[in-house]
Design a protein with these regions (language model features):
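Hydrophobic beta-strand anchors of alpha/beta hydrolase catalytic cores
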Residues: 36-37, 66, 115
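Conserved redox-active cysteine motifs that mediate thiol-disulfide chemistry
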Residues: 31-32, 38-56
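Short, internal strand/loop/helix patches
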Residues: 14, 82-120
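N-proximal helix/coil linker or "cap" segments that precede and/or mark the start of modular domains
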Residues: 1-15, 19, 23, 28-30, ...
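Structural microenvironment flanking redox-active thiols in thiol-disulfide oxidoreductases
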Residues: 48-85, 99-104
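Loop/turn elements at helix/coil->beta-strand transitions in domains of secreted/extracellular proteins
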Residues: 31-34, 61-65, 87-89, 120
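Non-catalytic, surface beta->alpha helical segment in thiol-disulfide oxidoreductase systems
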Residues: 111-114, 120-139
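Short, contiguous acidic/charged loop-to-helix segments that flank catalytic cores in large enzymes
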Residues: 4-5, 24-28, 40-46, 66-73, ...
């Protein structure tokens, strides 16, 4: 039986579409490769640091795509942060509704920001991965 949609390992990750300044991304369009979903905010030091570290690691790998979503409510702060942290902006988005957004609710992020590693079929294979865990999944 195919996995059901949910947020635990082995579940199919809830799909979403998000629009950035230059691009629109639909999670379903990324099937066929590993996807690292990173949820963070500039005011949350741990998630911000993790996002930056993972972003630099993903830039070195060719078999994973990173989708980075910030829940900052001010675009200026978001832009300043990604510049300062040298984040690749290709799949970097800001959800200006912040913690009131549907995406925040869907991924139940109220207990702290998280990241999810999805396999080629959109199934969650790991949560809150570190850089070393990420490279062991991809090798």
């Amino acid at each position: 039986t195919p996995p059901t949609e949910g947020l635990t390992i082995g579940d199919k990750a809830p799909t979403f579409t998000i629009c950035g300044e230059k691009q629109l991304i639909d999670l379903k369009d990324l099937r066929g490769k590993y996807v690292l979903l990173s949820f963070w905010a500039s005011y949350d030091a741990l998630s911000r640091m993790q996002n930056a570290t993972l972003n630099h690691a993903v830039a070195q790998a060719d078999n994973v795509e990173m989708v980075s979503v910030s829940f900052d409510e001010y675009k200026s702060i978001f832009n300043e942060t990604i510049k300062k942290d040298q984040i690749s902006t290709s799949n970097c988005f800001v959800e200006l509704a912040g913690v009131s957004s549907d995406l925040y609710q869907t991924y139940r992020l109220k207990r702290g920001f998280k990241n999810f590693l999805l396999d080629e079929n959109g199934v969650i294979v790991a949560k809150d991965v570190t850089v070393s865990e990420l490279s062991s999944y991809l090798n």
